[in-house]
């Protein structure tokens, strides 16, 4: 450990171990996944916190050898054992890019595209983007770089091949190969009744394809091919959302599909069920009518859904009448 700390110090990194880790130091070969919590602090007397992964509720996951935009994190992570807590004071040369990396991580934490604002910008927009990161603290740090302290807690170290990569960590080739496997895993989870977990798998597969699609010209054969792969996954995702009664999300996604593919029977059927669930009776009937028009063989299924809708409407009418009678009887 003394040798490691000495080498870090020569490179402008001061390590202070707060809690010793468990076992031997992993070899951290390329492809190793490190999961850790981090807190970034100013190195001045106040020690103001810039970012804290615990406050966001999810630890950081770093794949060694993937050329992460902040190389110093890979350097310091590779000196840690599982369970270790340590602080690293890093010279300016190591943290110049931190504001840009922090912006991407903050975007990810709130569900935004990590590259938001960095692609397809006109000249004026790019100038504005370069002048501001959208966060006052990051703007100040970018304009006046200073050493930073990283407080790190190593939660888990996984060797290559022992874990499934998150979509954001994959190469384009890895994403394309992973989609069918993630799709199958989602189907298995759904069959076993793990609906929320299945939805998460479908979401991951969609994220992979969306990321690939963003690199293609909209409307091009490649873009359309990817979109046609996304559609069945999105329908599976909608089925999960129907089961967990998140109907408005189903309405949004099915409508987006039908705006592009107005002959998609499954999208009409799922949207019809969602409309029925939120008492949009006319819209539900219209969608079910469209299902029959496109595929008359589904008449028994549609009839069952319409009977269920009519029964719910009658029950609701009776409940409303009883409620009003109660109001006016006082």
From Swiss-Prot:
Post-translational modification Phosphoserine, affected residues: 43
PROSITE patterns: FKBP_PPIASE, TPR, TPR_REGION
Record carries keyword Phosphoprotein: yes
Pfam families in UniProt: PPIase_AIP
Cellular location(s): Cytoplasm
Renumbered ranges of TPR repeats: 179-212, 231-264, 265-298
Domain PPIase FKBP-type: from-to ranges: 31-121
Annotated GO CC locations: aryl hydrocarbon receptor complex; cytoplasm; cytosol; membrane; nucleoplasm
GO molecular function: aryl hydrocarbon receptor binding; GAF domain binding; peptidyl-prolyl cis-trans isomerase activity; transcription coactivator activity; unfolded protein binding
Any single biological process term in GO: xenobiotic metabolic process
Keywords assigned by UniProt, alphabetized: Cushing syndrome, Cytoplasm, Phosphoprotein, Repeat, TPR repeat
Tissue: Widely expressed. Higher levels seen in the heart, placenta and skeletal muscle. Not expressed in the liver.
Source species, domain of life: Eukaryota
InterPro entries, alphabetized: AIP/AIPL1/TTC9, PPIase_AIP, PPIase_dom_sf, PPIase_FKBP_dom, TPR-like_helical_dom_sf, TPR_rpt
Annotated PANTHER family: AH RECEPTOR-INTERACTING PROTEIN, ARYL HYDROCARBON RECEPTOR INTERACTING PROTEIN RELATED
Subunit structure: Interacts with RET in the pituitary gland; this interaction prevents the formation of the AIP-survivin complex.
Disorder named in the UniProt entry: Pituitary adenoma 1, multiple types: A form of pituitary adenoma, a neoplasm of the pituitary gland and one of the most common neuroendocrine tumors. Pituitary adenomas are clinically classified as functional and non-functional tumors, and manifest with a variety of features, including local invasion of surrounding structures and excessive hormone secretion.
Role summary: May play a positive role in AHR-mediated (aromatic hydrocarbon receptor) signaling, possibly by influencing its receptivity for ligand and/or its nuclear targeting. Cellular negative regulator of the hepatitis B virus (HBV) X protein.
Name under which the protein is recorded: AH receptor-interacting protein
Species name: Homo sapiens (Human)
Lineage, uppermost ranks: Eukaryota, Metazoa, Chordata, Craniata, Vertebrata
């Amino acid at each position: 450990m003394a040798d490691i700390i000495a080498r870090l110090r020569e490179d402008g990194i001061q390590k202070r171990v707060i809690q010793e880790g468990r076992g031997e130091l992993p070899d951290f070969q390329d492809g190793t996944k490190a999961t850790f919590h981090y807190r970034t602090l100013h190195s001045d007397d106040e020690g103001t916190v810039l970012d804290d992964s615990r406050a966001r509720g999810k630890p950081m996951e770093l794949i060694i050898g993937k050329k992460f935009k902040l190389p110093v994190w890979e350097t310091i992570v590779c000196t840690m054992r599982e369970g270790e807590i340590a602080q690293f004071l890093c010279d300016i040369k190591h943290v110049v890019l931190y504001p840009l990396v922090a912006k991407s991580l903050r975007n990810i934490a709130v569900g935004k595209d990590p590259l938001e604002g960095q692609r397809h910008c006109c000249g004026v927009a790019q100038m504005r983007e370069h002048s501001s990161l959208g966060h006052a603290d990051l703007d100040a740090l970018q304009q006046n770089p200073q050493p930073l302290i990283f407080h790190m807690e190593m939660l888990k170290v996984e060797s290559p091949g022992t874990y499934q990569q998150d979509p954001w960590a994959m190469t384009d080739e890895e994403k394309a190969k992973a989609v069918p496997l993630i799709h199958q895993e989602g189907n298995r989870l759904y069959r076993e009744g793990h609906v929320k977990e299945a939805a998460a798998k479908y979401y991951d597969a969609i994220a992979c394809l969306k990321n690939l699609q963003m690199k293609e010209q909209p409307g091009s054969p490649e873009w359309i091919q990817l979109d046609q792969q996304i559609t069945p996954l999105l329908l599976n995702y909608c089925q999960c959302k129907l089961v967990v009664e998140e109907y408005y999300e189903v309405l949004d996604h099915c409508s987006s599909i039908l705006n592009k593919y107005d002959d998609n029977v499954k999208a009409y059927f799922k949207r019809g069920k969602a409309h029925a669930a939120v008492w949009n009776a006319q819209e539900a009937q219209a969608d079910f009518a469209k299902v029959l028009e496109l595929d008359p063989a589904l008449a028994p299924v549609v009839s069952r859904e319409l009977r269920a809708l009519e029964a719910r409407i009658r029950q609701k009418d009776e409940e409303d009448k009883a409620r009003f009678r109660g109001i006016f009887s006082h």
